[in-house]
Amino acid sequence: MRIDGRKNEQIRHVKVTRHYTKYAEGSVYIEVGDTKVLCNVSIEDKVPPFMKGTGSGWITAEYNMLPRSTETRKIRDIARLKIDGRTMEIQRLIGRALRSVVDLKALGEKTLWIDCDVIQADGGTRTTAISGAFIALVDAVNKLHKIKPFKIYPIRSFVAAVSVGIVNEEKILDLCYQEDSKAKVDMNIIMTDEGSFVEVQGTGEESPYTRAELNELLDLGEKGIKQMINVQKESLKMDSLWIGTGGNN
């Protein structure tokens, strides 16, 4: 029996609140168990210097944990005058995950800024940020599409992320913090609704793991991705109909 009574192949309860803030073009407050993340998407009508003149857009992400998102106060990055390595790794991961399902050429020379702020952390903050940010991204892109329809709708597929791991020799899905801190193996999996992998990050925290264990964890992660994408689809409802069509229907 897991700490919160879940089955091994069950993700935590997910609650999504769209249009959470009024200024961002896309804004989602996502709660996965006790992990809570605010995901805002802002649109700029320009691209970074290295993209100028290419006709393509860009998606970049920033990730931040509020000081009391954790059990003890976390010092803000600005107070240290630098971004810590973990933060840099996670925001790059979020950016890569979202770019993987967007046709940047179809987007045009615009930058989509993804801001993910962790309000409360109980494991899986990066996976929660990716899954929530995708919904906010759809809302932001749809705003553009309704004002001036894209020739090719830029979002090609859904993308979501989950964690899996081995705890007490049990393979489990969507680890909370207590489970994560005891994990022999910890892995983050990002996939599309088409079953394609975007990224797999796996670490043997205490000991190496076998190819057979890796395969089992990937299968478990795929089950979790399907659950999370179902949540995304239920949240977006009719606003998800353009995804993957490439057209203006």
From Swiss-Prot:
Alphabetically sorted, this entry's keywords are: Nucleotidyltransferase, RNA-binding, rRNA processing, Transferase, tRNA processing, tRNA-binding
Q: Which domain of life is it from?
A: Bacteria
Enumerate the InterPro entries for this protein.
Answer: ExoRNase_PH_dom1, ExoRNase_PH_dom2, ExoRNase_PH_dom2_sf, PNPase/RNase_PH_dom_sf, Ribosomal_Su5_D2-typ_SF, RNase_PH, RNase_PH_bac-type, RNase_PH_CS
> Which reactions are catalysed by this chain?
tRNA(n+1) + phosphate = tRNA(n) + a ribonucleoside 5'-diphosphate
EC main class here is: transferase
Q: Which GO terms describe its molecular function?
A: 3'-5'-RNA exonuclease activity; tRNA binding; tRNA nucleotidyltransferase activity
The record's SUPFAM superfamilies line, in alphabetical order, gives: Ribonuclease PH domain 2-like, Ribosomal protein S5 domain 2-like
- Enzyme Commission number(s): 2.7.7.56
One Pfam family, short name please? RNase_PH_C
The record lists phosphate as bound by R86, G124, T125, R126
Q: Does the keyword Cell wall biogenesis/degradation apply?
A: no
Subunit details: Homohexameric ring arranged as a trimer of dimers.
Q: In UniProt terms, what function does this protein have?
A: Phosphorolytic 3'-5' exoribonuclease that plays an important role in tRNA 3'-end maturation. Removes nucleotide residues following the 3'-CCA terminus of tRNAs; can also add nucleotides to the ends of RNA molecules by using nucleoside diphosphates as substrates, but this may not be physiologically important. Probably plays a role in initiation of 16S rRNA degradation (leading to ribosome degradation) during starvation.
HAMAP family on file = RNase_PH (MF_00564)
Q: Which family does it belong to?
A: Belongs to the RNase PH family.
Q: What is this protein called?
A: Ribonuclease PH
Q: Organism source for this protein?
A: Clostridium botulinum (strain Eklund 17B / Type B)
Q: What phylogenetic lineage does the species belong to?
A: Bacteria, Bacillati, Bacillota, Clostridia, Eubacteriales
